[in-house]
């Protein structure tokens, strides 16, 4: 689960992570009021008005601007709120701005990158720091990997003091800045572990002319499997920032990811789903989604899956590819038949069922009287997808 920058900063602040003063605003009037309050409390003569969307690259898209007065903050807020920002992370459709963060200005001396996430190759959390703050870390890793330091964190011991100091040395901090940097990194790790985050990314981490070390931006992602321990965080979820198809799928406990293709697919098991998507591509189509109905698929979940797939107007054909291990093929077939009657399938539907009760499932489909196309194996399914798209 992702949250907004201002929400992430509120959480980090509770763990002693230094962040600038900021106030969330939902209207130009609230932005002006926030700016007035910040100008009264700070010595700086500038505030920053920042669009709050679940994507990076906001500055380049015009979503981060400086204001030197409350009235200017009001005008900027009027320009940004309701606008659609298109960044390298939003896709061409962009994201509409519905809220802003008005934040105190900083006298920035240097910018760095600090992030903590799970390294799946080593099954450890990893601390990453870079001298190239404010840039896409993926681009830095590709072009100048020597500017990134990765420190593996033993889960039994956590982040040790010498590791935090090693990171601060790599960033070439000294004096009071070094102490503040070590304190910041330690607090960030403590927050990351305590809230069961899957990512805590500060880009940029800034050092001010006064020697302060602060998170100028913050990206926090939660491990969804641990949210039962942090039910208060569920209130931070902004479904308006998520794909509506994915939100609807989550209500039925379906693992769904929307793509930009023309062949909808319903599969059980992530590995088979990815293989099916490859096969669709090889057949000349393009997958419109990743949809894993899981091992406990029922007629109801299959019906919901079809409803979601059919809601995507780009879908021209549907492939159902099920291997009956835990899930029985006849239960899936019942769901396909029920969905066809409820939803009114008006697209070619290719069905390939193998495994437990596959023969019974095939009989159910044949006797249903519905226009369903049966496939024997992946090659046959690929050919029939090609025919369906060509027709």
Curated annotation (Swiss-Prot):
Mg(2+) binds at residues 203, 217. One of its GO terms (cellular component) is succinate-CoA ligase complex. Keywords: ATP-binding, Ligase, Magnesium, Metal-binding, Nucleotide-binding, Tricarboxylic acid cycle. GO terms for molecular function: ATP binding; magnesium ion binding; succinate-CoA ligase (ADP-forming) activity; succinate-CoA ligase (GDP-forming) activity. One of its GO terms (biological process) is tricarboxylic acid cycle. The keyword Ligase applies. Its cofactor is Mg(2+). Residues 9-248 form the ATP-grasp domain. It is an enzyme of class 6 (ligase). Pathway: Carbohydrate metabolism; tricarboxylic acid cycle; succinate from succinyl-CoA (ligase route): step 1/1. InterPro entries: ATP-grasp, ATP-grasp_succ-CoA_synth-type, ATP_grasp_subdomain_1, Succ-CoA_synthase_bsu_CS, SUCC_ACL_C, Succ_CoA_ligase-like_bsu, Succinyl-CoA_synth-like. The keyword Lipoprotein does not apply. ATP binds at residues 50, 57-59, 103, 106, 111. Pfam families: ATP-grasp_2, Ligase_CoA. Its EC number is 6.2.1.5. Succinyl-CoA synthetase functions in the citric acid cycle (TCA), coupling the hydrolysis of succinyl-CoA to the synthesis of either ATP or GTP and thus represents the only step of substrate-level phosphorylation in the TCA. The beta subunit provides nucleotide specificity of the enzyme and binds the substrate succinate, while the binding sites for coenzyme A and phosphate are found in the alpha subunit. Heterotetramer of two alpha and two beta subunits. NCBIfam families: PRK00696.1, sucCoAbeta. PANTHER family: SUCCINATE--COA LIGASE [GDP-FORMING] SUBUNIT BETA, MITOCHONDRIAL (PTHR11815:SF10), SUCCINYL-COA SYNTHETASE BETA CHAIN (PTHR11815). This is Succinate--CoA ligase [ADP-forming] subunit beta. It comes from Chlorobium phaeobacteroides (strain BS1). The gene is sucC.
């Amino acid at each position: 689960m992702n949250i907004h920058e201002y929400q992430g900063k509120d959480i980090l602040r509770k763990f002693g992570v230094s962040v600038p003063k900021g106030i969330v605003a939902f209207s130009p009037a609230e932005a002006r009021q926030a700016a007035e309050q910040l100008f009264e409390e700070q010595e700086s003569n500038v505030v920053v008005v920042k669009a709050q969307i679940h994507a990076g690259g906001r500055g380049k898209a015009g979503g981060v601007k400086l204001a030197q007065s409350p009235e200017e903050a009001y005008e900027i807020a009027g320009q940004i709120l309701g606008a659609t920002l298109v960044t390298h992370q939003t896709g061409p459709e962009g994201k509409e701005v519905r809220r802003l963060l008005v934040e105190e200005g900083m006298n920035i001396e240097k910018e760095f990158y600090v992030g903590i996430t799970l390294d799946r190759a080593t099954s450890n959390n990893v601390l990453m720091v870079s001298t190239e703050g404010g840039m896409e870390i993926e681009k830095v890793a590709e072009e100048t990997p020597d500017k990134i330091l990765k420190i593996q964190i033993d889960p039994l011991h956590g982040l040790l003091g010498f590791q935090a100091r090693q990171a601060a040395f790599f960033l070439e901090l000294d004096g009071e800045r070094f102490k503040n940097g070590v304190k910041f990194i330690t607090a960030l790790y403590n927050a990351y572990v305590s809230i069961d985050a899957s990512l805590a990314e500060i880009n940029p981490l800034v050092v001010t002319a006064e020697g302060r070390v602060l998170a100028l931006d913050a990206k926090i992602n939660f491990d969804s499997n641990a949210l039962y321990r942090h039910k208060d965080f569920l209130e931070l979820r902004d479904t308006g920032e998520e794909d509506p198809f994915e939100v609807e799928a989550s209500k039925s406990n379906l693992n769904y990811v929307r793509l930009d293709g023309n062949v909808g697919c319903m599969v059980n098991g992530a590995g088979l789903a990815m293989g099916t998507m490859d096969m669709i591509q090889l057949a000349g189509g393009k997958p419109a989604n990743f949809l894993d109905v899981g091992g406990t698929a029922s007629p109801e979940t299959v019906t919901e899956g079809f409803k979601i797939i059919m809601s995507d107007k780009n879908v021209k054909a549907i492939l159902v590819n099920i291997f009956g291990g835990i899930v029985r093929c006849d239960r899936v077939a019942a769901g396909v038949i029920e969905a066809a009657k409820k939803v009114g399938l008006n697209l070619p539907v290719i069905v390939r069922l193998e495994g437990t009760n596959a023969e019974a499932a095939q009989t159910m489909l044949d006797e249903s009287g519905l226009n369903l196309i049966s496939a024997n194996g992946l090659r046959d399914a690929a050919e029939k997808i090609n025919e369906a798209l060509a027709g």
